[in-house]
Amino acid sequence: MLDLIQTRRDLHQIPEIGLEEFKTQAYLLDVIEKLTTGKDFVQIRTWRTGILVYLQGSQPERTIGWRTDIDGLPIVEQTGLPFASQHQGRMHACVHDFHMTIALGCLERALEEQPKNNLLFLFQPAEENEAGGMLMYEDGAFGDWLPDQFYGLHVRPDLKVGQIATNTHTLFAGTCEVKIRFKGKGGHAAFPHEANDALVAASYFVTQVQSVVSRNVNPIEGAVVTFGVFQAGTTNNVITDTAFLHGTIRALTQDMSLLVQKRVKTVAEGVAAAFDMEVEVELKQGGYLPVENNPALARELMDFFDEKDGIELIDIEPAMTGEDFGYLLSKVDGVMFWLGIDSPYALHHPQMSPKEEVLAIGVAAVSSFLKKKAAE
């Protein structure tokens, strides 16, 4: 039987960033091959650093998918744990080591007997940086294994051990990276009339773009426009010719995201026109679409967990954080949910150290749900 805690600790020591998860993939494949030995209803495929494990059903009517992400973050770990990261500047601060371990535990249980329906376990790379789910889908990695229903989880520090939370609508916002560069004309600070100050134009844009959320977004739906980087100029007595802004757009539906993207671009172009200068606007959403749960499937999952002993189900509000599972759920009906890990530290914190008793709880809960879906 798989030692969940040791497996998690092994994975915790070898975090790798997106599409560089070579040791992680090798470790996972070794475990998967041991678990699947002698199981003639199992097939395994790889895609770059990703892995797909397909359990052929005995009388399949559909394919049920379970997705886990496998990448780490470029963070220096500060937990002081004896099994801390052995990769300098890399850490499983988003707790994907837990996600992988739970998936392996569920795979082990699913292999006890051939399921009626097909089951697909996806070990997906590059959730944090490259939208690996989108890359796999667009590259045809699923082939004829593409699920009819897709499920997945993410751990959450502010939920207690034993709590599961989701809803019947949007769980994560869609995110879009924004880069804007104003191009004016540089000059001496004493002669502003001979220059065209990109810093002033960019500053004007920052104030004007605040109207997008306050005046273009339905307050009930919500959206966020935040610029965290503003770079302009090199010294105090020179008018700069360029100003660079780097920010993010977040919205709970794709329609709202597209509206906000359009308005941000329009405001930037309007400001540039008013100041008689050029502007470049780069909007990059990629695969980070809103994670929109299928209402009927979400209700089914919520009802199932609500009746499970040891599980407290919470109907939770959406989070404005992003998650690339949204892309796959835009192609396949499915559900994502939160699993409580009761940590004082937020996700991506260098001291993140979740409670390991969650592993057994997660495996028991998820495997029982997948068993139900596989038998329908």
From Swiss-Prot:
Classification via InterPro entries: AcetylDAP_deacetylase, Amidohydrolase, Bact_exopeptidase_dim_dom, Peptidase_M20, Peptidase_M20_dimer
Record bears the keyword DNA-binding: no
CDD domains named in the record: M20_Acy1_YkuR-like
Keyword Amino-acid biosynthesis found: yes
Gene3D superfamilies associated with the record: 3.30.70.360, Zn peptidases
Catalysis performed (reactions): N-acetyl-(2S,6S)-2,6-diaminopimelate + H2O = (2S,6S)-2,6-diaminopimelate + acetate
Gene Ontology molecular-function annotations: N-acetyldiaminopimelate deacetylase activity
EC class name: hydrolase
Pathway assigned in UniProt: Amino-acid biosynthesis; L-lysine biosynthesis via DAP pathway; LL-2,6-diaminopimelate from (S)-tetrahydrodipicolinate (acetylase route): step 3/3
Keywords: Amino-acid biosynthesis, Diaminopimelate biosynthesis, Hydrolase, Lysine biosynthesis
This enzyme's EC code(s): 3.5.1.47
Active-site residues from the entry: D69, E128 (proton acceptor)
Stated role: Catalyzes the conversion of N-acetyl-diaminopimelate to diaminopimelate and acetate.
Name this protein carries in UniProt: N-acetyldiaminopimelate deacetylase
Native organism: Streptococcus pneumoniae serotype 4 (strain ATCC BAA-334 / TIGR4)
Lineage, top ranks: Bacteria, Bacillati, Bacillota, Bacilli, Lactobacillales
